[in-house]
Amino acid sequence: MKRPRPHCSFCGLRPPETGRLLESPIEDVYICEDCVERAQEILAQEERRAPKGPSRLPRPQEIKAHLDQYVVGQEAAKRALSVAVYNHYKRLLHPEAEIGKANILLIGPTGTGKTLLAETLARFLDVPFAIADATTLTEAGYVGEDVENVLLRLLQNADFDVERAEMGIVYIDEIDKIARKSENPSLTRDVSGEGVQQALLKIIEGTVANVPPQGGRKHPHQEFIPVNTKNILFILGGAFEGLENIVKARVGKTTIGFTGERREREEPLEVIPEDLIKFGMIPEFVGRAPLIVQLHPLGEDDLVRILTEPKNALVKQYQELFRMEGIELRFTQAALKEVARRALKRGTGARGLRAILEKAMVDLMFEAPGSGVKEIVFDLPHLDHPLKALEEARLRQAS
């Protein structure tokens, strides 16, 4: 029996009415080149319509477990952030549900992990991320950066894929520095305070912002990239020095633990929106960051753990660099505790650890390659005399 001429199983056409036929492993099933092209176009359209958020939304427990690998302590903050970020992206996956956006305010002293938490979240979720410093921003008409430049950084990190940027995370640091100077609105414009809050308010609450692709100040004749900010998660961070006195006055306490030097493990007193308004944040701005997350000051033990425990801990980084030279590097507990003590004395928290350790290690990293030693033990005295660690290593190896 003569087989019928093959035809496209999708459009029904036969060559030469259509292009070349591609045969399926299933007998007598074909697709023509024209239908392949149409299928690719349909898939591309579907991909463009699909949300550009995380490819898979991890549960809060998974998010916190990832944060645990990089951020030491701050258990309550990590739990709260994990739930908040999960709910934010769950809301985007279900646009039919009318759930408002809940931006996040992180309160804690310098070096407690505010920026690290935001960075780690964005990296884990694989969404675009941008950091801005609120102190560099000014309202339109003043010297400084327009608030839209915050979104430009997000666009740049999304390779100018606008839809992907619109699902990103923005961390704005030093947000406490744009508090107005008094609780009562001033008759004059406060360039570094209320005006910037008002300008930021528009993009934080959700608007279509016109972003200058080259950055800098906007002018009438340049082209803009429209960016809808309604689904961008804004995480705001600040030390809010002096806020403890406002909370203390409200609750009638004489001590507070969320800023300054820690006394044992006391819990920070709860900050409420009214405290932030008294501090100098405008009510509308406070209302757009309803989740307030407080971070503990870090103690000596915390800083030692930060040096050694995270996946990318400083000690592990230095050990890997020396291992590449065939040298095993060990740090004594006494040396690590002294690094932590010096960082605490500087008042820079975890941020000061790298500077202290780098200063001590630079001479050692200069001399050790090619020295022939197999193991270096870095002890407390070597913080100020690092080359003694190399001399002692040579003596041990020779004996």
Swiss-Prot record:
Question: Which residue ranges traverse the bilayer?
Answer: none
**Full protein name:** ATP-dependent Clp protease ATP-binding subunit ClpX
Family matches, as PROSITE patterns: CLPX_ZB (PS51902)
Organism of provenance = Thermus thermophilus (strain ATCC BAA-163 / DSM 7039 / HB27)
The record's SUPFAM superfamilies line, in alphabetical order, gives:
Glucocorticoid receptor-like (DNA-binding domain), P-loop containing nucleoside triphosphate hydrolases
State one molecular function term (GO).
Answer: unfolded protein binding
- Extract the PANTHER family matched here: ATP-DEPENDENT CLP PROTEASE ATP-BINDING SUBUNIT CLPX-LIKE, MITOCHONDRIAL, ATP-DEPENDENT CLP PROTEASE ATP-BINDING SUBUNIT CLPX-LIKE, MITOCHONDRIAL-RELATED
List the NCBIfam families: clpX (TIGR00382), PRK05342.1 (NF003745)
Its subunit composition reads: Component of the ClpX-ClpP complex. Forms a hexameric ring that, in the presence of ATP, binds to fourteen ClpP subunits assembled into a disk-like structure with a central cavity, resembling the structure of eukaryotic proteasomes.
Tree of life domain: Bacteria
Q: Which residues form a coiled coil?
A: none
**CDD domains from the UniProt entry:** RecA-like_ClpX
Q: Where is the ClpX-type ZB domain?
A: 1-51
Provide a GO biological process annotation.
proteolysis involved in protein catabolic process
The record's GO CC annotations read: HslUV protease complex
Show the InterPro entries listed in the entry.
AAA+_ATPase (IPR003593), ATP-dep_Clp_protease_ClpX (IPR050052), ATPase_AAA_core (IPR003959), Clp_ATPase_C (IPR019489), Clp_protease_ATP-bd_su_ClpX (IPR004487), ClpX_bact (IPR046425), P-loop_NTPase (IPR027417), Znf_CppX_C4 (IPR010603)
Q: Which positions bind ATP? A: P109, T110, G111, T112, G113, K114, T115, L116
Entry keyword set? ATP-binding, Chaperone, Metal-binding, Nucleotide-binding, Zinc
> What family is reported?
Belongs to the ClpX chaperone family.
Q: Where does Zn(2+) bind?
A: C8, C11, C32, C35
**Task performed by this protein:** ATP-dependent specificity component of the Clp protease. It directs the protease to specific substrates. Can perform chaperone functions in the absence of ClpP.
